[in-house]
Amino acid sequence: YRRLLQPYFNRCRWKPDDFKTVIKAITEATAEYDDGETAICFMGHGTEADSNAVYAKMQDMLASEGYEHYYVGTVEAEPSLEDVIAKVKEGEYKKVVLEPLMIVAGDHANNDMAGDEDGSWKKEFEKAGYDVTCLVRGLGELEPIQQLFTEHAQAAIDSLK
């Protein structure tokens, strides 16, 4: 899908409205857990490329929108699992909800996030003393995200005309 959307992304990187759409979608999808006692943590893929800055941008926008119980980390880069655990420890949380910040919930979601082996996000949060719930679903399952992809695909097609 990246190649299809590349002409669009080359012109319109990190659109604030896209972030707002994603934030609205993920906060609505996890609203039942936002009880003040639960940290809601999203695990993105991450990359060493400059585009990794989207995770810090997402965290900043979540905070600016008042979602102080929401945290963003990555499997492959920064912020790391250790960074997220440190942030969560600053709060007085009893529970943690983990969800992938990925279009599809595949290997990283099932193993690195929700796996039962040492080193998984689930196990590391449990070791830190939290009751952990894993929501193994991709962002692509959320209707607002599907709509966003449709809009981007249409914009990419239109840019080729």
What role is predicted for each listed range?
Residues 1-161:
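Extended amphipathic ligand-handling, pore-lining, and cofactor/metal-binding catalytic surfaces
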